């Protein structure tokens, strides 16, 4: 199972209006400073692990944050979201994560006219690994290390190639 696309981003930091497509195997976010790479990672972490946006995440605190994700999965994973799947592809679901105000939590639903609710418990069981952006990469991202970040990076490389 993987996030194939972030279809819609509304009112979240500097990413409003952006569409982000992901590869099913491995993705790299590369670019200049302050263009939103970390914001993309934090968006995924907030939606799939934390479940609540902070006041600083809202571009305009009078408007809700709305994020629309397309998640694809294998035949073996059919049923993970119970009877919910996209009509045009039974191996995918388009999820909406929406937080109406700073004081609330994110609500999740299947993007259909019925807006079938998806529980946070279901969302949290998806495998999301969040690795925080480093400020001193030369010291912290060292593939020679056998503990900490080096261990994680080596594991990801060995099991992804």
Question: What are the residue ranges of the model-derived segments?
Answer:
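Short acidic, glycine-rich loop/turn motifs
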Residues: 8-11, 71-75, 99-100
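Beta-strand secondary-structure signal
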Residues: 6, 66-70, 94-96
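Core residues of folded domains in eukaryotic genome-function proteins
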Residues: 25, 65-67, 127
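Conserved P-loop NTP-binding catalytic core
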Residues: 41-90
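Glycine-rich phosphate-binding loops of NTPases
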Residues: 55, 75-161
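Pre-Walker A-like glycine/lysine-rich segment at the N-terminus of P-loop NTPase domains
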Residues: 1-46
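Solvent-exposed residues in well-ordered beta-strands and their adjoining turns
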Residues: 23, 70-74, 134
């Amino acid at each position: 199972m993987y996030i194939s696309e972030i279809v819609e981003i509304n009112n979240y930091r500097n990413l409003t209006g952006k569409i982000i497509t992901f590869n099913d195997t491995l993705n790299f976010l590369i670019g200049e400073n302050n263009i939103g790479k970390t914001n993309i990672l934090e968006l995924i972490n907030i939606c799939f692990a934390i479940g609540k946006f902070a006041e600083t995440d809202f571009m305009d605190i009078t408007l809700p944050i709305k994020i629309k994700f397309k998640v694809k999965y294998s035949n073996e994973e059919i049923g993970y979201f119970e009877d919910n799947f996209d009509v045009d592809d039974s191996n995918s679901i388009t999820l909406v994560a929406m937080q109406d105000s700073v004081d609330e939590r994110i609500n999740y639903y299947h993007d259909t006219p019925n807006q079938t609710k998806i529980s946070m418990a279901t969302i949290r069981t998806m495998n999301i690994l969040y690795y925080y952006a480093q400020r001193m990469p030369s010291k912290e991202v060292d593939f020679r290390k056998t503990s900490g970040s080096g261990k994680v990076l080596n594991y990801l490389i060995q099991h992804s190639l």
